[in-house]
Amino acid sequence: MRRPALLASLLALLIAACGPIGLQAHTISLAYKSGDTYRYALHVALKYTVGAQGLSVPINLDMSGKETVKVQSVDSTGTADLSINLTDLSVKTTVNGTTNTTTTTTTTTVEVKVGRDGRIVSVNGSAFGSSGSLPGMVGADGGLVSAILPDKPVKPGDTWTKSYDQTNPMHSTGAYHVTTDNKYLRDEKVGSVNTAVVESKINADLDLTFDLASLNGQGGSSLLPTSGGSAALKGMSMKGTTKSDVTTWIDLGARRIVKSHSTGTIDAMIDLNMAAGATTPGLSGPITFKGTQTLDMNPV
């Protein structure tokens, strides 16, 4: 009769000494390898509203396609140069009630630098191709998003914070100031892959200036007017905030992104920089820019 009680006491002591069984801390930061290739199905949905002089213009975009991510190189800090090719894009845009749908088999290529903690260091190009030229959430224009990962081993339930500045995003002069609250939610299997599920709540203050060359360099059908006084447009400035909730599944073995889901909002004010004495019909500033965005990367 005493033996079961003794065994139970010993087990209780072991648990108290060793902590919860199975909740071992491990490293979940990214560890890409040069030459690796990963494929995803990409879906992006934007719902923006642009307001000026009492007018409100809804702008919606829904895009889906295939995404191939190739690791070009990895430096000594773990920052990876990724080449992202997007194909079979289907894009539906609705501006003020008028809908346009396009499909293409041509390839859009975006170059992205991503740190080992998942932060997007830089983006050259746009996943949205010719579908628009105003910025959205932090890093999302590259077609790849990640939760912000810890620098040290962690276990499910652990939390951490990070803040950083991302300078000159989207061919602009200026910066995002980013603060993040992050949590290792759980371990979960995605198909046959063991993953760590990490959630990041990301807030960013943005203060950006675009000159005309950088606006044209983004390509696409600008949301700014293309006739009349717009010929005198020299650039624009944007100030505001973005908020994102990003959940990412990290391969515990290969330490790469298995899939990612992001939702977010933007609330910004835009001022147009016109040549002296010139005006832009229908869009004299300031202009409000608000909306929501979702992005999903799923393995294929």
Residue ranges of predicted features:
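Bacterial N-terminal signal peptides that target proteins for export
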Residues: 1-8
